[in-house]
Curated annotation (Swiss-Prot):
Catalysed reactions, as listed in the record: tRNA(Val) + L-valine + ATP = L-valyl-tRNA(Val) + AMP + diphosphate
Organism: Chlorobaculum tepidum (strain ATCC 49652 / DSM 12025 / NBRC 103806 / TLS)
Family, as annotated: Belongs to the class-I aminoacyl-tRNA synthetase family. ValS type 1 subfamily.
Coiled coil (UniProt feature): 831-901
Name of the gene encoding the protein in the UniProt record: valS
Protein name: Valine--tRNA ligase
Pfam family, one: tRNA-synt_1
Domain of life: Bacteria
């Protein structure tokens, strides 16, 4: 029946050919991934929506993307096959700082700066760059086979998204939730822009703690000593602060001291902020260069002035003009020593804020910026998570979320960049600000057309926090449409825990504020991928494999399967490229098992049409099944129950292992092997055809269950089961459901056969019986029922154990035989003629000596009180477990030796 020989499945699985045939282009061409609001609003379909975290337009595919998008694809494909109107919303982020930096670097190579070009021409260059390179990440994601509705692809600078951003800013300003204020912000001297607190990462740094003496103005023979790690800011000191409860300085409060080098007189003030235990208990107050000092200065009406500029160099007024801040630090310490003000230096390790992108120390900088008041937005966003309206997976990330929300600060949203959404604020010649959706509206409000727009742009995250809304066509407050009514709130967000506050929390705030509902129901936090040494993947370490090269070597399905298989919920992933052999081997196993089953189909059905008709009408019938078939159906339905339960609990890693374990173990290692024996034995045509249809039916169910994980190979093989049209795809097939009628199926007979096969193999291995030699086994059944069960394996035993088996309730044990007991039934394997007794005795004696020595070393270690009391409890428990296992092994080896003696 060659016309349907595995529907021409090649002998060897070639992932290049299969995946090229099924690239997303084919699925897209037939509209597989399209979702329509009409099917929800008019036909009553249940919606299921996933938001793609928009990758930076500057990005290229990483293993982090692979894990994140594979998980999203699994959720969306599963929902689609569960009959839901599944919508996955794709898009990219304009990535303000990153994109501007890339384009500026390109211009510098051409000898041009953005200032040479001017704002308009520079932005034209950025748009040109985006058109040429900005789609790379999406093309690479398509190679992964992800099933987005690509018609809905959105870029955060697209007209619709930009309209939403501007209207949101205007609305929040008019509500009093956006304001312009003079505050200490995080300044990146490389990117030359303000940063939000979340864009600053803390790193441990070793500096000098500098102790400086400040003489009293009225009596320079007396002084007060402070300790600081920033002596370069001494020229901007406006006070010395002490704790009002610190008796050491009680008599100095209100006195004036002389600022070293500067020579100015500043007061000693009392403030509860001062930590009595830190340093000397006295602090220099430099409000322009420290946010805490700034708050102290406001409380005491102190002046504020700066000595470090935007370029992190000392300003003209301070006497060290033009020096880099760190060079100035060294010079000022030297000058303090020369002038007699330096008391001492100490090594000091502390956490310092760095720009996450530029990797330079952030400078606290006093400037006018735009802010969002976060407290009114945070309270309802905290409540919905506390109340369980939004669920986190794993749950422990709720604690991180709570910490952020309970300690929230106003959000600095202005950035000193050109690429981004320009702040919709205009100024008249008197300095009044007019916030409006357009220049024309601003002119109308101001009563003049002589207005200049704010030069700054909005933080990239200001567009991202609206993502659940803008991807569905929302253009601002009071905006509504059919997509929003059908697909908002979305269902599942898959993202990294590192942006819980950057993005997750802010989306929750925006959704609640503008739509009165949460933006999503569940948040799945992905694992961090590390190399095999436990290090985070990075280009600088050279330990970050190129996913496209991995795909070329192992296949997309293999990479997708592997990365989910090794990524338990809430645990870091140790990834080495060689681990993808796991996925490749599994794909090969699926392919080979499918080819075998299809070959049996050819043997039992005269024509393709005959099989197709039989399979279309196939229903598993117990009376036509062998014990292996009934066992398979019991195991298959148990697998489906566990599969769906794992998906309901977001245990994708468990789900993948459940299917892998069933297919490789139950289906291939046991049922397919049993089927070989069954079909070569004395079997009627009806039962044979039924057995093959059962094998194909379960195979098809496994392919459907695996499709969300391995979309290419599953669609390829599914099309080989029966004739399909070009418009058909497994992606829209119904996901198999467990049949409760098989839940209580008595599978004990085949379980006994399986256990007996395993023990025969184990005994052969224990006595070193060569694999190519056939042995004689005798099984003494414990009861008539056990004998009946074992007789169902008569055809299986020779094929799976290379043993001829004699069965009975009163059979005799052969001389010189190895013995064991399986579920109360006695097993004997005749050894005479199979092995050299003397050689085997020598081998066993040598092994006993080796294990005995190991036992003695373990006993010695566990008798050492120091080890037992100091080692971690799990380590001690593991050593005890090894000891028990070794003792059991010696007893078993001694028993085997006895048999040979």
């Amino acid at each position: 029946m060659s016309d349907h020989s595995a529907q021409n499945l090649e002998k060897t699985y070639n992932h290049h050919e299969v995946e090229e045939r099924w690239r997303s282009a084919h699925w897209e061409a037939i509209g597989t991934f399209h979702a329509e609001h009409s099917r929800v609003l008019k036909e009553g379909a249940t919606p299921y929506t996933v938001l793609m975290p928009p990758p930076n337009v500057t990005g290229s595919l990483t293993l982090g993307h692979v894990l994140n998008h594979t998980l999203q694809d699994i959720f969306i494909r599963y929902a689609r096959m569960m009959g839901k109107e599944a919508l996955w919303l794709p898009g990219t982020d304009h990535a303000g700082i990153a994109t501007q930096t890339v384009v500026e670097k390109k211009l510098r190579k051409e000898g041009v700066t953005r200032h040479d070009l001017g704002r308009r021409d520079f932005l034209d260059k950025v748009w040109e760059w985006r058109e040429e390179y900005g789609g790379l990440i999406l093309r690479q994601l398509r190679k992964l086979g992800i099933s987005c509705d690509w018609r809905r692809n959105l870029f955060t600078m697209d007209e619709r998204a930009s309209e939403a951003v501007i209207n949101t800013f205007v609305a929040l300003y008019r509500e009093g939730l956006i304001y312009r204020g003079r505050r200490i912000i995080n300044w990146c001297p490389v990117s030359q822009t303000a940063l939000s607190d979340e864009e600053v990462i803390m790193k441990s740094r070793r500096d000098k703690l500098v102790y400086i003496s400040y003489p009293l103005a009225k009596d320079p023979t007396r002084s007060i000593t402070i300790a600081t790690v920033r002596p370069e800011t001494i020229l901007a000191d406006v006070a010395i602060a002490v704790n009002p409860n610190d008796e050491r300085y009680a008599d100095l409060i209100g006195e004036l001291v002389i600022v070293p080098i500067a020579g100015r007189h500043v007061p000693v003030i009392a403030d509860d902020y001062v930590d009595i235990e830190f340093g000397t208990g006295a602090l220099k107050i430099t409000p322009a260069h420290d946010p805490n000092d700034y708050e102290v200065a406001k409380r005491h009406n102190l002046p504020v002035f700066s000595v470090i500029g935007k370029d992190a160099r000392m300003t003209d007024e301070c006497g060290y003009a033009g020096m880099d801040r760190f060079d100035a630090r060294d010079k000022i310490v030297a000058d303090l020593a020369e002038l007699g003000y330096l008391v001492k230096l100490e090594e000091y390790e502390h956490n310092v804020g760095y720009s996450e992108r530029a990797d330079v120390v952030v400078e606290p900088y006093l400037s006018e910026q735009w802010f969002v008041k976060m407290q009114p937005l945070a309270e309802p966003a905290l409540k919905v998570v506390n109340d369980g309206e939004i669920r986190f997976h794993p749950e422990h990330w709720i604690n991180t979320y709570r910490h952020w929300m309970e300690n929230i600060q106003d959000w600095c949203i202005s950035r000193q960049l050109w690429w981004g959404h320009r702040i919709p604020a205009w100024y008249d010649d008197k300095g009044n600000v007019w916030v409006a959706s357009s220049y024309e509206e601003a002119c109308h409000l101001a009563g003049t057309d002589k207005l200049s727009q704010d030069e700054d742009v909005l933080d990239t995250w200001f567009s991202s926090w609206l993502w659940p809304l803008t991807t569905l066509g929302w253009t601002g407050p009071h905006s509504d449409n059919d997509d929003l009514r059908a697909f908002y709130p979305t269902d599942t967000l898959v993202t990294g825990p590192d942006i819980i506050f950057f993005w997750v929390a802010r989306m929750i705030m925006a959704g609640l504020h503008f739509k009165g509902d949460v933006p999503f129901r569940d948040v799945y936090f992905t694992s961090i991928i590390r190399d095999m040494k436990g290090r985070k993947l990075s280009k600088s370490l050279g330990n970050s494999p190129d996913p496209l090269k991995v795909i070329d070597t192992y296949g997309t399905d293999a990479l997708r399967f592997t990365i989910v298989y090794i990524a338990p919920l809430g645990q870091d992933v140790l990834f080495g490229e060689e681990k993808c052999e796991l996925g490749r081997n599994f794909a090969t196993k699926i392919w080979n098992a499918s080819r075998f089953v299809f070959m049996q189909r050819e043997k039992l059905f005269a024509t393709r049409e005959e099989f197709v008709e039989a399979f279309a009408n196939f229903t598993p019938q117990r009376e036509l099944m062998s014990s292996a078939g009934r066992w398979l159906m019991s195991r298959y339905n148990a697998m489906l129950e566990r599969y769906h339960q794992a998906m309901a609990n977001f245990k994708v890693n468990d789900m993948v292992k459940i299917v892998h374990e069933f297919f490789w173990g139950d289906y291939c290692d046991w049922y397919v092997e049993a089927l070989k024996s069954e079909l070569t034995g004395d079997i009627t045509e009806e039962r044979g055809r039924h057995a093959v249809c059962l094998a194909v039916s379960v195979l098809e169910g496994v392919l459907k269950a695996l499709h969300p994980v391995m979309p290419f190979i599953t669609d390829e093989i599914w099309h080989a089961i029966a004739p399909r049209s070009a418009e058909e795809t497994i992606a829209t097939e119904a996901m198999p459901q467990p049949d409760a009628s098989w839940r209580g199926e008595d599978a004990a007979a085949f379980d006994l056969v399986r256990n007996m096969v395993s023990e025969i193999r184990s005994l052969r291995s224990a006595f070193n019986v060569p694999h190519d030699l056939r042995a004689q086994a005798v099984i003494r059944a414990s009861s008539p029922a056990a004998l009946v069960a074992l007789q169902t394996g008569r055809a299986i035993f020779p094929a799976m154990t290379k043993c001829e088996v004699e069965l009975g309730e009163s059979v005799e044990r052969p001389a010189h035989s190895a013995a064991s007991v399986v579920d109360g039934n006695e097993l004997f394997i005749k050894l005479e003629g199979l092995i050299s007794f003397e050689k085997e005795k020598q081998r066993l004696e040598k092994e006993i000596t080796k294990v005995t020595a190991y036992i003695e070393s373990l006993e010695k270690k566990l008798s050492n009180e120091k080890f037992v009391s100091n080692a971690p409890a799990d380590v001690v428990a593991k050593e005890k477990e090894k000891l028990e296992e070794s003792r059991s092994m010696v007893l078993k080896l001694q028993g085997n030796l006895e048999v040979l003696s």
